């Protein structure tokens, strides 16, 4: 179980965890978490992309909501840019065809990753049915690396639906 008193405690707990966001959420809310994709598109990389890929290389852009399997409540909205060519064969297909979150797929495929904070998101999330701009408590952007090679950049918005799981200080 994870104890979080408020949004500042949520940020501190997230920054201090070494596990996946999915594991953290499951401990916080007490239910299994599934990923529901809104977008799953191939895009061309731009210069200075933070992933160390050439301009024009194809990357996977994915937008998804992490939801409670039982409650159906949205807890996190995330946008990811992924270098699929640097991940095991089948990663992109599993991501596209299942509700398994990214972190769990990486664990199942035995891909060890490290998280490197990039900072706050550059802007607001794209409009979607699960979230409005004012509906989040904490936002962050980080890069995942495997064997010191960047494999993806993820921006997450932790939604106000997490507030009922805060414990009294």
What are these regions (language model features)?
Residues 1-141, 145-169:
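N-terminal domain-onset segments
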């Amino acid at each position: 179980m994870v104890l979080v008193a408020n949004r500042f405690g949520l940020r501190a707990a997230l920054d201090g965890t070494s596990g996946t966001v999915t594991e953290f959420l499951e401990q916080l809310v007490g239910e299994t978490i599934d990923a529901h994709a809104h977008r799953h598109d191939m895009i061309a990389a731009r210069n200075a992309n933070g992933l160390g890929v050439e301009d024009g290389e194809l990357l996977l852009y994915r937008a998804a909501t992490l939801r409670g399997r039982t409650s159906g409540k949205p807890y996190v909205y995330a946008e990811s840019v992924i270098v699929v060519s640097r991940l095991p064969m089948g990663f992109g297909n599993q991501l596209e065809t299942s509700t398994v979150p990214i972190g769990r797929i990486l664990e199942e495929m035995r891909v060890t990753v490290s998280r490197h904070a990039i900072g706050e998101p550059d802007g607001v999330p794209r409009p979607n049915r699960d979230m409005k701009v004012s509906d989040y408590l904490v936002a962050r952007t980080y890069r995942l690396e495997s064997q010191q090679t960047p494999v993806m950049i993820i921006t997450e918005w932790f939604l106000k639906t997490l507030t009922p799981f805060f414990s009294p200080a």
